[in-house]
Swiss-Prot record:
The keyword Nucleotide-binding is assigned to this record: yes
Subunit structure and binding partners: Homodimer. The tRNA molecule binds across the dimer.
Assigned protein family: Belongs to the class-II aminoacyl-tRNA synthetase family. Type-1 seryl-tRNA synthetase subfamily.
Annotated residues for binding of L-serine: T231, A232, E233, E285, S385
Positions bound to ATP: R262, S263, E264, E349, I350, S351, S352
Broad class of the protein's primary localization: cytoplasm
Catalysed reactions listed for this entry: tRNA(Ser) + L-serine + ATP = L-seryl-tRNA(Ser) + AMP + diphosphate + H(+); tRNA(Sec) + L-serine + ATP = L-seryl-tRNA(Sec) + AMP + diphosphate + H(+)
Gene designation: serS
Organism encoding this protein: Rhizobium etli (strain CIAT 652)
Protein name: Serine--tRNA ligase
Length: 427
């Protein structure tokens, strides 16, 4: 959430930033609403001050045996007591209205973020590796998995409907191996602390990360008003909600391997075959909590940690800087990692790493105490996928496919596969 004080002082800057995102100007309406709220606050404060002063004057009038003045003051205090609740309620309503309006305003992009409308305006930052060179014809992951006999969409549909998958045997093990490899890499070599956290959260947690109220249609909600997490970013980031941290203990780096749940409400007709766009999928999440001075360097570091997963798997990928029109709601700058899928003859997103500034921290009231001046400031938050396990499985199947239809296990995963070096068709 943005700072209303900053908006009051920089209305043109807000509208210019929104224009870069393709959004309508909001500064005038926000400032007008804030002025109404501040007027109500001032009116309530003036009324309280007058009531308190009148109460003191009653005592003075009584001491001077001025009964007429005392009665007049008592009547004034009684009237103020009657009027005050309505003014305080107006203040509460205007504050809630302003906070709701602010909660729907996206974050301000950094100046170095390319301006653009959609994914076609994203910029290639770097490319790693090369496309595999084969004599055989590439296949899509669902063709490979079904031919091997370990990927079943029909039974998954019987169980749960569309956008679900059943994996069995060595493919189920490969999925587990990928997740274990990622979490081991990030905890053993990249300095992240592993966290096991709930898969269901309250609305307040999703508000903190910016998923609510704007994106409720993308979430699965339980009958007792909890939500299934769309990403472990929600739980990991909210670990510091309503806390004041010591600056010298920053950065905090958390990672978790969890299922993620998404309704894919806006994805009708997109990637309907296979595992690319699922209602339920495993993902290794990375979250950093830091201060303003360290956030940009931490963003580069986090992205490098995610890239290392793909490098060690020997996968060809590119890192994209997202344009203003394709960035997430809470992001100030985002890098997407896109892995090469031979079966699609295309790069597809496998990780997204974002720096959010203090946008989420304001929503969570998460702060740190400066080590020198002891002033409390909002933390800066970052999040990224390190990486999406299902999409990594897709990439391994398509890039390690052999001419006979078998799939070679990448060397880095062999310690997790119980001696299996190749996945072959089920007998």
């Amino acid at each position: 959430m943005l700072d209303i004080k900053w908006i009051r002082e920089n209305p043109e800057a807000l509208d210019a930033a929104l224009a870069k995102r393709g959004a309508e100007p909001q500064a005038q309406s926000l400032v007008a609403l804030d002025e109404k709220r501040r007027s109500a606050v001032q009116k309530a404060q003036d009324m309280l001050s007058r009531r308190n002063l009148a109460s003191k004057e009653i005592g003075a009038a009584m001491a001077q045996k001025n009964g007429e003045l005392a009665e007049k003051l008592k009547a004034e205090v009684a009237e103020l007591k009657t009027l005050l609740p309505a003014i305080e309620e107006e203040d509460r309503q205007l504050t809630a209205e302003l906070n709701d309006a602010l909660s729907r305003i996206p974050n301000i992009p950094f100046d170095d973020v390319p301006v653009g409308k959609d994914e076609h305006d994203n910029v290639v930052t770097r490319t790693v590796g090369e496309k595999p060179r084969w004599n055989h014809t590439p296949k899509e992951h669902f063709e490979i998995g079904e031919a091997l006999g370990y990927m079943d969409f029909e039974r998954a549909a019987k169980l749960s409907g569309s956008r679900f998958t059943v994996l069995t045997g060595p493919l189920a093990r490969l999925e587990r191996a990928l997740g274990q490899f990622m979490i081991d890499l990030h905890t053993r070599e990249h300095g992240y602390t592993e966290v096991s956290s709930p898969l269901m959260v309250r609305a307040e947690a999703l508000f903190g990360t910016g998923n609510l109220p704007k994106f409720e249609e993308d979430l699965f909600k339980t009958t007792d008003d909890r939500y299934l997490i769309p990403t472990a970013e929600v739980t990991l980031t909210n670990l510091v909600r309503e806390e004041i941290l010591e600056q010298e203990k920053l950065p905090l780096r958390f990672t978790a391997l969890t299922p993620s749940f998404r309704s894919e409400a806006g994805s009708a007709g997109r990637d309907t075959r296979g595992m690319l766009r699922q209602h339920q999928f495993w993902k290794c999440e990375l979250v950093s909590i830091t201060d303003a001075d360290s956030a940009i360097a931490e963003h580069e570091r986090m992205t490098a940690c995610a890239e290392e997963v793909l490098k060690r798997l020997g996968l060809h990928f590119r890192t994209m800087t997202l344009c203003t029109g394709d960035m997430g709601f809470g992001s100030r700058k985002t890098y997407d990692l896109e892995v090469w899928l031979p079966g699609q003859n295309a790069f597809r997103e496998i990780s997204s790493c974002s720096v959010c500034g203090d946008f989420q921290a304001r929503r969570m009231n998460a702060r740190y105490r400066g080590k020198d001046d002891k002033t409390n400031r909002f933390v800066h938050t970052l999040n990224g996928s390190g990486t999406a396990v299902g999409r990594c499985l897709i990439a391994v199947l398509e890039n390690y496919l052999n001419e006979d239809g078998s799939v070679t296990i990448p060397d880095v995963l062999l310690p997790y596969m119980g001696g299996l070096t190749k996945i072959e068709r089920a007998a």
